[in-house]
């Protein structure tokens, strides 16, 4: 397992040794069919070296799609899933890369790992608690708000971080303290400081996570009242009227309203508590 994780650390070769880019694209065309279980499990971890590949056809179209396909198809072994979690956790809390691809895609793949653990538990309570902390801390440290670029593809750090929060919030083995930490972290990105205007669906992704954390019923009314009071506060503005006098204020107003609208829609569309698993899919 340690050797598997080491092979996936930042700086690992992309494509992995002995594999060409043409091989990776052929893997996608084959719908990620790898007959040998051992080969598939080794390749899964080695693909993490391509998380920051500048080509979206590789980064998104092969790496993410392959790992998502295998994880959802229960085609990876528990040791491999553990190695993925360990490597991705280290990546998320490691150095930021200039192009800005590595961390958002580490969060996105880790959301699939967290989903696998939610469906069939793999991790110990201690590892899962550590994953909650990494999800919260990594979301709070996002300061690259680039979304989609027509040639470079997606970055989408906040949305991918929210996807990870969602999977953990849905997990019945994540208790109230973990949910509280996840919601406090999410609140920091609903209306980030600066002239940041969300235009790539970030409010919707955060709203889904919040709705289903709320529906777990583990956080009391006092918590949610304080949480929404913080969201409704105009600070650092003197009042909401002041938002119209500066670009940063307009961004705060725009993002706060976008989140509240998304939250209202998610609350109506999400259905009953019995729909949690389907929505998490």
Per-segment meaning from a language model:
Residues 173-267, 271:
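Long, repeat-rich segments with strong aromatic
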Residues 14-33:
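Short N-terminal segments immediately surrounding and downstream of signal-peptide cleavage
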């Amino acid at each position: 397992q340690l050797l598997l994780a080491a092979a996936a650390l930042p700086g690992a070769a992309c494509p992995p040794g002995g594999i060409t880019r043409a091989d990776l694209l052929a893997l996608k065309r084959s719908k990620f069919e790898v007959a040998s279980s051992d080969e598939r499990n080794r390749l899964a971890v080695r693909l993490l070296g391509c998380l920051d590949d500048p080509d979206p056809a590789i980064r998104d179209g092969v790496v993410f799609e392959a790992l998502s396909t295998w994880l959802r198809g229960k085609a990876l072994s528990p040791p491999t899933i553990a190695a993925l979690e360990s490597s991705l956790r280290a990546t998320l809390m490691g150095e930021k890369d200039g192009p800005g691809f590595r961390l958002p895609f580490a969060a996105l793949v880790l959301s699939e790992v967290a989903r696998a653990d939610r469906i069939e538990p793999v991790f110990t309570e201690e590892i899962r608690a550590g994953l909650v902390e990494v999800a919260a801390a990594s979301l709070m440290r996002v300061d690259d708000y680039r979304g989609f670029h027509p040639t470079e593809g997606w970055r989408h750090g906040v949305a991918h971080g929210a996807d990870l929060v969602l999977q953990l919030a849905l997990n019945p083995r994540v208790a109230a303290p973990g949910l509280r930490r996840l919601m406090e972290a999410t609140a920091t990105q609903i209306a980030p400081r600066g002239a940041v205007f969300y235009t790539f669906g970030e409010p919707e992704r955060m709203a889904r996570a919040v709705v289903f954390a709320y529906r777990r019923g583990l956080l009391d009314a006092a918590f949610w009242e304080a949480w929404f009071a913080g969201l409704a506060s105009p600070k650092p503005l003197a009042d909401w009227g002041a938002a119209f006098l500066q670009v940063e204020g307009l961004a705060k107003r725009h993002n706060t309203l976008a989140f509240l609208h998304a939250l209202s829609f998610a609350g109506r569309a999400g259905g009953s508590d019995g729909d949690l698993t389907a929505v998490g899919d």
